[in-house]
Amino acid sequence: MKIGILVAMSKEMELLKGFISEGQAEHGRVFDYLVGKVGKNDVVIQQCGIGKVNSALGAAEMITLYEPDFVLSTGVAGSLDDDLHSGETIMGVWYHYHDVFCGKELVKGQVQGMPSTFTPLEVGINTEGDLCVRIGKILGHNIRIAGVLSGDQFVVDPKVKARLKATFPLASVVDMESCSIAQTCYRYKVPFVAIRIISDNCEEEQYEDFWKYVEKWSFDKTKKILEELA
């Protein structure tokens, strides 16, 4: 199995370098890659940067160059639910844009010609032995499933949070990359899963203590998934 990993931060890339055997640096047209092995699996890691365009470009280049069997994205997200707190981990089970509007005849957040929401079935996960189920079993009680909103906005305003929750009541978290990666994987017919650690409650600036440990927390989750899938 070949696993493509899109990481959010440079420190996360640095942590993964020490975990991958036979690692070597390679260069695409836009992005740099770390290529190696975890157990029997081939692994390709890329730091794509923040936002919808960066993440879509990163996913497209990775899929084109390396043809991974599935793509895993790690990073952080803000919580839209009162019972989902900083430091908790979620696995996305559907992905939807919150800042797209293509006309009244379409669902808010739907890109014309695309599904209104990208789900595991639509991006091919069920063809890979229920990948979401496998990852859920690996992380067990340490992970929650969630609907993910994405847009080019870092949400720290209570009014924006309330508007998002009112418009998309089933969504639990918001980030800036997951849905654009899901859309890219949908177009390329490559399975995709996003794992996100909750950074804040979307109502205030991120917690200082959280940012001291987030890379290590995210690395631990990614490492465990790769170990168990290997």
Regions found by a protein language model. Give the residues of each.
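Regulatory input/activation interfaces that engage signals or partners
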Residues: 192, 197-230
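A C-terminal functional module that forms or caps the active site or interfaces directly
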Residues: 154-204
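N-terminal short beta-loop-beta anion/metal-coordinating cradle
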Residues: 1-66
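Mid-sequence, gly/pro-rich, charge-dense loop/helix-turn segments that line enzyme active sites
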Residues: 80-168
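Active-site-proximal beta-strand elements of phosphoester/diester hydrolases
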Residues: 44-48, 147-149, 195
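Short, acidic/turn-prone active-site loops that include or flank metal/cofactor-
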Residues: 29-31, 50, 94-97, 197-200
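Proline-aspartate-enriched helix->loop->beta-strand connector
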Residues: 67-72
